[in-house]
Amino acid sequence: METLKIAFTDSNLLSGIFIVFALAAYFSYDLARNYMSALIELKLKESVDLAKRRLATARTESERRLATAELLSAYNQICIAYLNKQILSESFQRSYRAKIERIVNSEEYDEFFQDSPEDYLGIFLVHEKFKNRKRGA
């Protein structure tokens, strides 16, 4: 599966989607689903990594705000995918769970959440899901 993740870049995304459907038609739905999951996980991880790099290289306050908003947006995309458990592998979900908790509990991002909470709805839905799971345990 790692080889499949490495093979995907933005330039051949359409080819990757075509391959998913070909795999589903020829071999099995599970193989195609795993392939699509790997593609989605790769794209989500790339968007987080890119936002982190932009945040690290930001020089002005406006660049930092923009990079932070991009990072939160990337984490929000992960949360939306997390809500649809069939998309992400268990290991991928576990690796980002603590990060999402830290984001919601950190005062650093409160300003962004207050300015446009609808942009980060996925983060809040996943956070509520975690809280409810803790109460039930």
Language model region names:
Residues 36-137:
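Amphipathic alpha-helical "stem/stalk" segments
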